[in-house]
């Protein structure tokens, strides 16, 4: 009877350890997938909309500042 009790305790410990490891792996996957924030997240954090005043690219939701105003789309630079 004692051997059965010890065996059950060992089995319970092994199962709980396995469940804990599996939970940590799932959390790591969630963290990996949530690193890149969608553009909607950038709008909520306070970036400037199209045709709003800006000084640098990082201020605009489109990530494209044309010296004074945010552009709707990041156009390729033109060589003059």
Swiss-Prot record:
A single GO molecular function term of this UniProt record: ion channel inhibitor activity
UniProt KW keywords: Cleavage on pair of basic residues, Disulfide bond, Gamma-carboxyglutamic acid, Hydroxylation, Ion channel impairing toxin, Knottin, Secreted, Signal, Toxin
Modification 4-carboxyglutamate occurs at: 56, 59, 71
Residue(s) carrying 4-hydroxyproline: 76
Entry comment describing in which tissues the protein is expressed: Expressed by the venom duct.
InterPro entries hit by this protein: Conotoxin
Signal peptide: 1-19
Domain of life: Eukaryota
Compartment(s) where it occurs, according to its Swiss-Prot or TrEMBL record: Secreted
Keyword Signal: yes
S-S bridge residues: 47-61, 54-65, 60-70
Function according to Swiss-Prot or TrEMBL: Gamma-conotoxins may act on voltage-gated non-specific cation pacemaker channels (HCN).
Domain notes: The cysteine framework is VI/VII (C-C-CC-C-C). The presence of a 'disulfide through disulfide knot' structurally defines this protein as a knottin.
Family: Belongs to the conotoxin O2 family.
Protein name listed in UniProt: Gamma-conotoxin-like Am6.6
Species, as recorded: Conus amadis
